[in-house]
């Protein structure tokens, strides 16, 4: 069972990294970042259960990561809509806000 969960987590992480590297759209990059965070959470919970099932350190840490992901999921689209209003595009290479 441990191997199956770790393989699924590795696939999710790999898909997220590939999508984050190759995506040119910010919405797609945010979704890939969520995939990466979910894969990390799966690893935390799996290793916490495998190594010491009496202590809940991995589970608690995954709850913190879920809270951070929820904040990112709430703030990210707001930032994206602001960038879209100003630049009329959500492409990553056109979103340099330092120069106008």
Curated annotation (Swiss-Prot):
GO terms for molecular function: oxidoreductase activity, acting on NAD(P)H, quinone or similar compound as acceptor; quinone binding. Keywords: Chloroplast, Membrane, NAD, NADP, Plastid, Plastoquinone, Quinone, Thylakoid, Translocase, Transmembrane, Transmembrane helix, Transport. It is found in: Plastid, Chloroplast thylakoid membrane. It is a multi-pass membrane protein. One of its GO terms (biological process) is photosynthesis, light reaction. GO terms for cellular component: chloroplast thylakoid membrane. Its EC number is 7.1.1.-. It catalyses: a plastoquinone + NADH + (n+1) H(+)(in) = a plastoquinol + NAD(+) + n H(+)(out); a plastoquinone + NADPH + (n+1) H(+)(in) = a plastoquinol + NADP(+) + n H(+)(out). It comes from the Eukaryota. The chain crosses the membrane at residues 1-21, 31-51, 60-80. InterPro entries: NADH_UbQ_OxRdtase_chain4L/K, NUOK/Mnh_C1-like. NDH is composed of at least 16 different subunits, 5 of which are encoded in the nucleus. NCBIfam families: PRK05715.1-2, PRK05715.1-4, PRK05715.1-5. NDH shuttles electrons from NAD(P)H:plastoquinone, via FMN and iron-sulfur (Fe-S) centers, to quinones in the photosynthetic chain and possibly in a chloroplast respiratory chain. The immediate electron acceptor for the enzyme in this species is believed to be plastoquinone. Couples the redox reaction to proton translocation, and thus conserves the redox energy in a proton gradient. Belongs to the complex I subunit 4L family. HAMAP family: NDH1_NuoK. This is NAD(P)H-quinone oxidoreductase subunit 4L, chloroplastic. It comes from Cucumis sativus. The gene is ndhE.
């Amino acid at each position: 069972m441990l191997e199956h969960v770790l393989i699924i987590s590795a696939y999710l992480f790999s898909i997220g990294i590939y999508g984050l590297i190759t995506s040119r759209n910010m919405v797609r990059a945010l979704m890939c970042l969520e995939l990466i965070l979910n894969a990390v959470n799966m690893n935390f919970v799996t290793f916490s259960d495998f190594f010491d099932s009496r202590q809940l350190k991995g589970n608690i840490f995954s709850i913190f990561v879920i809270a951070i992901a929820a904040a990112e999921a709430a703030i990210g689209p707001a930032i994206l809509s602001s960038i879209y209003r100003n630049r009329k595009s959500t492409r990553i290479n056109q979103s340099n806000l330092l120069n106008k």
